Amino acid sequence: MSRPEFDEYAANYDEIRKQSLGYLGKDLDYYARAKSRLVRKMIGGTVGSVLEFGCGIGSNVAQLRLEFPQAIVAGCDLSLESLSIARAHNPGVHFFSLSEEPPIKGGFDAVVAPNVLHHVAPDERDHVIDTIYEMVQPGGSIIIFEHNPYNPLVRRVVKNCPLDRNAVLLPLSESLSLVRRRFTLSAHGYTTFFPPLVSHLAFLEPWLAWLPLGGQYYVRGIRDQQCTATDSTWGNKS
């Protein structure tokens, strides 16, 4: 999806998601909380800076701030309308557009890209990973989340969601290849097995990560420690 398309839907983004998800979308924060907690589980809670790449209207940023209260949390997106809403909902957070500002090289301990790549044309995905790589500090992490195309319910939701009208879902194997090209793979698995209505079963998710039926999957990669970061004081929160 291009920047103008995201701008078109920014004001009604959450409402569109709720309508597309139906009974699965009654608590959108549930999904943001689950992602943020999984990120914390993978990288620990002592990082100095976290960027959400493709932050939209900032829903995940709010949850990341709760999970990483001592870290600087930032967000970037192509959609200026979405960024405007994100700033209004998350005062004090730095949001920026990659179309207007250069990437902050080596600026973050972790870059999280939740459900971004399926909106990117397949022949442009390597470039996105390259951009994220430049923004991650040596020893830092990339963490991506993507819809699982092998889940029939996910495919139905994506098919009926205006936000995903140009989406091209990618399987875990493709995401692993994309991340492996620039990072050392650290973790991957399936997640989002239980919607809000049965959230009491979510404690089972770690034992199901191997099962390719989850609504989404995650991949974590680590940037080589021997690389040299070029700039930024993002990791030093004062």
Regions flagged by a language model, labelled:
Residues M1-I43, V47-G56:
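Conserved class I S-adenosyl-L-methionine
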Residues I57-E101:
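Class I SAM-dependent methyltransferase SAM/SAH-binding core
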Residues V112:
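A conserved beta-strand element that flanks and buttresses the S-adenosyl-L-methionine
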Residues D126-P138:
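A short glycine-rich, Lys/Arg-flanked "PGG" loop and its adjoining helix->strand segment in the class I
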Residues G139-E146:
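Conserved beta-strand signature within the Rossmann-like core of class I S-adenosyl-L-methionine
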Residues S141, S186-S238:
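A C-terminal cap/extension of S-adenosyl-L-methionine-dependent methyltransferases
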Residues V158-E174:
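Acceptor-substrate binding/catalytic loop of class I
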